[in-house]
Amino acid sequence: MRNERNLKHNNNKIDAVFKKLKEEKRKAFIPFISIGDPDIETSFDIAKTLAENGADIIELGFPFSDPMADGKVIQRSYERALKNKISMEDALNFIKRLKTFKDVPVVLFTYYNPVFVMGEKFAEGAEEAGVEGVLVVDLPPEESGEFIKYIEDRNIYQIFLLAPTTDADRMRLVLSYAKGFVYYVSVTGVTGARKSLPETVKSNVTEIKKITNLPVGVGFGISSKEQAKDIAKCSDAIIIGSRIIQFIEDNINDKGLILKKIAEFSKDIRSVL
């Protein structure tokens, strides 16, 4: 059944982005921000700034009150966004609006509860908004059958995480469900910028690539263009969240400076990929 549905759709923009980048011998820059941090309008301007300054795909986090996979920087980002009472409907409208500005592929990063509450209506809303991918942090592939059916019928991919602790059998299972790209978590633990990344990242990504033809993006901990350039040698995409969100936190009362810093950082990262 899953294969039949896969044959129906083959024009997800995530695939097109990676195909084009491969032809150009470049790697994808995938920034992450939280919808509604520090407020809905500023976060929208940040998303636009990223789209204008080299983002190939944008990952947008739906603020959640108990983000188990996220470090302190993203937790605080979600706390700021939650004060603005961002609903899933707000998030989908945000994406729809972003798409009218620039049709950059969007992956919605969420936890399962907000999606579960909406059921199939979530998939309908995501399709209407133009979402290309959904990363549900706490929904493992073997429990996502109904959810995958809802979204794949609408040509939306579920993006899955692989960690350094994922064993070979588990990796094969996850990859059998994966579409678009696979998100390799470079370090054990939670998100957050780090001064150095484990030596095992490259060898682990190489092992993943032996099992799948899907592009592999690396995230968690990348905070500089030097790290990005190094990791890009073995991966197909660089995913950066905490470092970008730190610019928001450090300049919370100066929107112009937030946008300037993020634009400069994005151009810097893009230049080495």
Locate each region found by the language model.
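Conserved, mostly hydrophobic/aromatic
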Residues: 31, 50, 61, 126, ...
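Alpha-helix-loop-beta-strand connector modules within alpha/beta enzyme cores
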Residues: 71-107, 150-159, 163, 200-216, ...
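Conserved N-terminal beta1-alpha1 strand-loop-helix module at the mouth
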Residues: 2-103, 120, 257-261, 267
